[in-house]
């Protein structure tokens, strides 16, 4: 039984329960967002029950906008809306050069400890990628979020900046580089998982922090250890191939006609213009994150584990770059400590642990008999 057929069988079962009433746009969103079932498969299966399903043309754009709204509410940890009337769109400098760390900007508005600039290199939390930190005129920036098309910088304390004043700003470049490595690696892992597990794989969500990253994938069952090893091997193969990473802006309609709806991989990409990020011959996605210029810049990709987080959705935990090196060092230290405690070298550690477990079972049974 193919993976695609397994997904369709699950869909058939779910639709047989839902078909008694009309499947609304809201239910289509739920099926896609919670179970990884695309509206195209729903429409195909509904025909078998004599039902016609109308899929909105902007379905995937609505999914993206829903994710964007949820993400910003989480990112700002507040439901407040700032009064940004007459404030023009913030010019985002991070698209042109992800490694640019210093820039000058003009103060547009200050609201308590929140600063709006005319242009910025600070990336706001979006697309599952955490915000940048750094300084504005020496004052610490601890959070960055987007309200509509205006980027808001949150300082650690209040500061009186005169509107119109030019200020020198700097982002934490090491943090930015690590986040970029995790973001590009997310696209790489997504492509690797699609190759190993099947073409039904779609990204249902992701998070990129500095220590580790996660990617949620539409898959009908848990991922085995063997499959995880294959995904990691394929991901690192793509890194070693030194593939170019491109980005350009296209009108939404043109992007959809050129690349299809698979460009919507769970990230938040609302708007008429889409930024298309592509890895040569491997992956094409609509994405607004900061990315490397070449897959080789990601360094080693280390997959930590996977977990089934809901029906039809599995999560892969991984690290890349310096974070992967730290993870490897931590694992090495744990192994060395285990060897020290058991008084064996690393080659004999597995058998020593097995013997220890056998001894534990023996004495456990002996203790039960004596009681």
Residue ranges of predicted features:
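A glycine- and charged-residue-rich anion-binding loop/surface
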Residues: 1-371
């Amino acid at each position: 039984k193919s993976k695609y057929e397994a997904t369709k069988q699950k869909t058939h079962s779910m639709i047989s329960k839902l078909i008694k009433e009309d499947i609304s746009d809201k239910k289509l969103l739920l099926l896609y967002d919670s179970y990884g079932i695309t509206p195209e498969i729903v429409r195909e299966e509904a025909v078998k029950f004599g039902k016609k399903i109308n899929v909105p043309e902007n379905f995937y754009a609505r999914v993206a906008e829903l994710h964007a709204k949820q993400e910003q509410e989480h990112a700002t940890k507040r439901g407040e809306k700032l009064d940004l009337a007459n404030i023009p769109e913030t010019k985002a400098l991070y698209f042109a050069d992800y490694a640019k760390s210093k820039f000058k900007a003009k103060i547009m508005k200050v609201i308590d400890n929140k600063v709006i600039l005319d242009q910025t290199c600070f990336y706001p939390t979006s697309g599952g990628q955490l915000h940048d930190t750094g300084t504005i005129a020496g004052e610490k920036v601890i959070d960055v979020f987007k309200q509509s098309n205006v980027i808001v910088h949150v300082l650690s304390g209040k500061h009186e900046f005169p509107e119109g004043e030019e200020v020198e700003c700097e982002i934490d470049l090491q943090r930015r580089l690590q986040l970029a490595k995790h973001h590009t690696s997310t696209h790489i892992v997504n492509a690797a998982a699609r190759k190993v597990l099947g073409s039904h794989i779609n990204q249902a969500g992701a998070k990129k922090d500095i220590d580790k990253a996660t990617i949620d994938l539409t898959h009908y069952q848990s991922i085995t250890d063997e499959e995880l090893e294959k995904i990691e091997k394929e991901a690192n193969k793509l890194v070693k191939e030194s593939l170019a990473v491109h980005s350009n802006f296209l009108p939404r309609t043109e992007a959809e006609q050129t690349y299809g709806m698979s460009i919507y991989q769970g990230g938040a990409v609302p708007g008429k213009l889409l930024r298309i990020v592509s890895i040569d011959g491997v992956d094409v996605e609509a994405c607004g994150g900061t990315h490397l210029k070449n897959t080789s810049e990601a360094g080693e990709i280390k997959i930590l584990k996977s977990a089934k987080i809901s029906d039809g959705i599995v999560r892969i935990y991984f690290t890349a770059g310096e974070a992967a090196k730290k993870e490897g060092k931590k694992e090495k230290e744990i192994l060395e400590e285990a060897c020290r405690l058991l008084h064996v070298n690393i080659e004999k550690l597995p058998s020593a642990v097995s013997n220890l477990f056998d001894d534990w079972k023996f004495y456990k049974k002996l203790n039960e008999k004596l009681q």
